Amino acid sequence: MKRSLLALLVLVGAVLAPTSAEAADGPALRVPEAALDAALVCSGDVGGSAHNPILLIAGTTLTPEVFVWNYGPALTALGRPFCTVALPDNGMADIQVAAEYVVHAIRAVSAASGRDVDIVGHSQGGMVPRWALKYWPDTRARVGDVIGLAPSNHGTVVASAVCRPGCAPAFWQQRTGSAFLTALNSGAETWAGVDYTNVYTVLDEVVAPNLNDHGSSSLHTGQGRISNVGLQDVCPAHVADHLTTGTTDGVAFALVVDALTHDGPADPARLPADACTRLLMPGVDPVFLAVNEARMATVVATQVALYPHVPAEPALAEYAR
C-alpha cells in the first residue's frame, strides 16, 4: 500500500517541522513544504519495520514510476519498506533545487521510521544525495548507505557536446568540470558514518568515462567507507549499459542487496556464486520487459528533446560559493 509521508508521519506521531537546532543546520529550504510533501510516497511499514527504510531516487529525465516494475516489487518481496521522491521536472531542472527534495525526504523518512535511511539512486539520483549530505549536515546522522547505480558523481564528458547549443539545467550541471560538480567534490567526497557503494559499468554511454575505479562514478576521499564496483570486474563478460544498470541488472541488484544487508558498503566477494548468471533482477517480469524498457526510453527521449534549454549553467547557490 502506498501513502504519502505526511499521512505516515501523522500515524506514527512524528512531526515534519525541524527543531530549532535542525533549522540552523544547513540553509533553509526554499521549496514550499507542500511540494516537498507531495513528492514523497512510501510503501510498506516504514514506521514499524525492523529494517532501515530505503529511499529510491530516479535519474535525470525519469520519475519514480521507473521503479514500479523493478525495485518496487523486488524490495516488497524482501520485506523492505521503501519510499520514492520525485525530483522536480523529471530531474531536468536545477539540481540544487532537487537536492532540497532529497533533504526533506531524508528528514521525513528518518523521523517516521526512527531509523537511518538507506538511499538507492540511479545516475543523478545516486549523486544528488551527496549534495544534501554536504550542505545540510544534519542529514548525515540520518543516512546509513548511499548506493549509487551508475552515479554521475564526477559528471560526464558527453554533456559538454550535448550542451554546446544549450541544454537543460541538470545537463549543464552534470558536465565534467561544471561549477556544480566542482563545488560538490571540493574537500571531502564522503562523510563519516555513511557507507558509499558506487556501481558502474565500462559500457556506460551516458556517465563517462567509467573504465575503472577512477572514473566518473567512483569516490575516494573523505571519512565514509567506500566501495567502487565495476560490473565487469565482478563478471568480466557482463553486458550492462547506463539505463539497465539502474533498472534491470541482476548483478547490480545483488550488490545493492549486499550493501543493504551488511555493515559497510557492498563487497563483491560476498555475492552468490551464481550472481553472474542473473541477467535480470528480481521484480522484473521478462514478459513485459520490452514494453517497460520502451516506455522508459520514450520518457527519456521526450525529456531530452522537449525540455527547455538554457544557455548556461545555473549559478551556484550562495551557500555553495
Residue ranges and their predicted role:
Residues 25-31, 39-116, 290-294, 299-318:
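Active-site catalytic motif of lipid deacylating hydrolases and related acyltransferases
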Residues 192-321:
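C-terminal catalytic-base region of ester-bond hydrolases, centering on the histidine
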Residues 58, 85, 96-190, 206:
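Serine-dependent carboxylesterase/thioesterase catalytic core
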Residues 1-23:
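Secretory targeting and sorting signals
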